[in-house]
Amino acid sequence: MIYFDNAATTKPADNVIKTFERILNNIYGNPSSPHSYGHEASDIMDKARAQVARYMECLPEEVIFTSGATESNNLAIKGIVKRYKKNGKRIITTKIEHASVLEPMKELENEGYDVIWIDVDKSGKIDIDQFKRA
């Protein structure tokens, strides 16, 4: 089989699968728990966070693990909106975003944010004139 939907998900590398399987089978404590299983899970998460931080050239405390794209998009959108609320309540987005972006935008619109929905052409390119007017 040839898989063409890598925009939605991509098969992890074999070494990632092996590591993940080993951890799932042997280290299943809640990293927030005070017992030894929790400490072991927490240590592994800390190590992974440090590795990602080195790769991304950021601080480990700037790395946040989420369960997937929807949670990540919600966290990013809502976090940025809260952080920059003092700069205004206008948000510009397109009408063809993934549902994990569209839904929080609709929520923000219902909360009083001025969400500007930019049209796109048949190729998915935004209407530049509409964007400039926004």
Describe every region a protein language model picked out.
Residues 1-134:
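Pyridoxal 5′-phosphate
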